[in-house]
């Protein structure tokens, strides 16, 4: 009987505390679907023996019960169980594989050697929303942890880096943590080399069969090893084809060049002198040439030809520009100084031939020499479009010069944002239409 009375007293005390605490935390009235308030009835636990015999404040799970019922901190905050401690020095001195730890730095537990003794205190952090579904494989993420989608925080100096990406984080390490930056770059190179090897094995099958030897061409000749000071006669080793324009071969001294082996080498006769200036400049070598001396001479001749073509184009551009300036000066009666150096935005020289028709202005724009029209954002593409719309003849000439120059400097590459020249009607040739009279 005494036990029952004690239980009744405890139940009465708990109901009083419940009636005082719950109304202050949870609202007792809730609106229903019709806009009327409905009163929440108090629960009656007198008939539950398990609740009376086991009180929540006497059990070990009371803090969890309190958090789940009132504060709901467990569902809002994430308390990480493992924290990175960058004050620990790694025994091996190298970073561990970042692919084993995932993308977020909060889940990375690698022992990273750091130049700054910095340990992370266990504090609750909000779990960010990751924008990408794939993991971030850059090892610099081990030095940062996310704050949100745009901000990350450095674990070494606690500075916030905006626009969270691997490039910005690597630049931060390069500027403020040089030793750690060297470790990150080394680990990144190693990771990329391993990743490239794995991908190549996945996409390409490695053949174990040896390579087939290259067959010896029937028209190849064996060149014996020659002393460096002896005179070399091409007629001893090469058969000259009879031709009306062919010139007898003359002996010439061989240059002292080291050979890779003492054995004789086989050289196929696959190269011939091209027709043109080369035959006139080096007639003593004959038509075919397969020696290293001939190859070096060919390269030098090509360089000379490229330089001569480039100089010729520059001279033509300079002459056209001077002629246009002189014509405009005579027409308007003003003197234009051609010796003044134009305003150069870039350190390198403007090489496009369209610059012969434009000059820079003081406000950063460009002015057409032909029509004095101002072109904003001066660049070769805008200049070409201006000539295409207003000066079709000059546009065709500039386009052909540009293609010719590109063939010399960059053979086989044609990169331009303007269309090829077509026939545009000039302003001088006004199209006349027949006039029909209405009777």
UniProtKB/Swiss-Prot annotation:
Q: What is the gene name?
A: dpy-20
What are the Low complexity biased-composition ranges?
Answer: 96-116
Sorted alphabetically, which SUPFAM superfamilies does this protein's record hold? beta-beta-alpha zinc fingers
ATP-binding found in the keyword field: no
Q: Which species?
A: Caenorhabditis briggsae
Which region ranges are annotated with the description Disordered?
93-116
Can you tell me which residues bind Zn(2+) 2? Answer: 368, 371, 386, 391
Q: Please report the name of this protein according to its UniProt entry.
A: Protein dumpy-20
Q: Which residues form a coiled coil?
A: none
User: Pfam families under this entry?
Assistant: zf-BED
- InterPro entries attached to this UniProt entry: Cuticle_assoc_protein, Znf_BED, Znf_C2H2_sf
Q: Which GO terms describe its cellular component?
A: nucleus
């Amino acid at each position: 009987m005494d036990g029952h009375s004690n239980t009744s007293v405890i139940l009465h005390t708990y109901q009083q505390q419940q009636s005082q605490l719950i109304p202050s935390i949870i609202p007792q009235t809730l609106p229903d679907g019709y806009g009327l308030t409905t009163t929440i009835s108090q629960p009656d636990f007198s008939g539950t023996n398990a609740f009376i015999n086991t009180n929540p404040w006497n059990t070990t799970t009371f803090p969890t019960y309190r958090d789940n019922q009132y504060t709901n901190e467990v569902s809002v905050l994430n308390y990480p169980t493992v924290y990175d401690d960058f004050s620990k020095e790694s025994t091996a001195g190298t970073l561990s594989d970042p692919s084993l730890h995932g993308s977020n730095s909060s889940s990375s537990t690698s022992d990273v050697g750091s130049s700054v003794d910095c340990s992370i205190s266990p504090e609750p952090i909000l779990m960010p929303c990751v924008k990408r579904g794939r993991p971030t494989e850059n090892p610099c993420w081990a030095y940062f942890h996310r704050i949100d989608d745009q901000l990350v925080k450095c674990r070494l100096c606690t500075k916030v880096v905006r626009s969270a990406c691997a490039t910005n984080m690597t630049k931060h390490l390069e500027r403020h943590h040089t030793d750690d930056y060297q470790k990150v770059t080394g680990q990144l190179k190693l990771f990329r080399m391993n990743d490239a090897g794995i991908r190549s094995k996945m996409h390409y099958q490695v053949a174990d069969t040896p390579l087939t030897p290259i067959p010896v061409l029937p028209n190849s000749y064996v060149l014996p090893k020659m002393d460096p000071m002896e005179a070399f006669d091409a007629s001893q080793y090469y058969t000259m084809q009879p031709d009306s324009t062919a010139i007898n071969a003359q002996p010439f001294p061989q240059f002292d060049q080291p050979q890779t082996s003492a054995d004789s080498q086989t050289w196929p006769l696959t190269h011939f002198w091209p027709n043109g200036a080369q035959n006139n400049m080096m007639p003593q070598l004959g038509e075919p040439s397969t020696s290293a001396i001939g190859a070096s001479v060919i390269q030098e001749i090509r360089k000379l030809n490229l330089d001569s073509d480039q100089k010729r184009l520059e001279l033509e551009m300079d002459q056209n520009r001077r002629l246009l300036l002189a014509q405009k000066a005579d027409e308007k009666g003003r003197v234009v100084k051609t010796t003044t150096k134009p305003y150069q935005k870039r350190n390198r020289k403007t090489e496009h031939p369209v610059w012969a028709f434009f000059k820079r202005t003081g406000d950063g724009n460009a002015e057409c020499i032909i029509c004095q029209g101002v072109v904003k954002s001066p660049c070769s593409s805008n200049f070409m479009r201006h000539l295409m719309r207003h000066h079709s003849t000059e546009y065709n000439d500039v386009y052909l010069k540009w293609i010719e120059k590109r063939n010399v400097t960059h053979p086989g590459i044609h990169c331009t944002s303007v269309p090829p020249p077509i026939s545009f009607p000039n302003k001088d040739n006004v199209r006349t239409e027949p006039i029909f009279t209405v009777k």
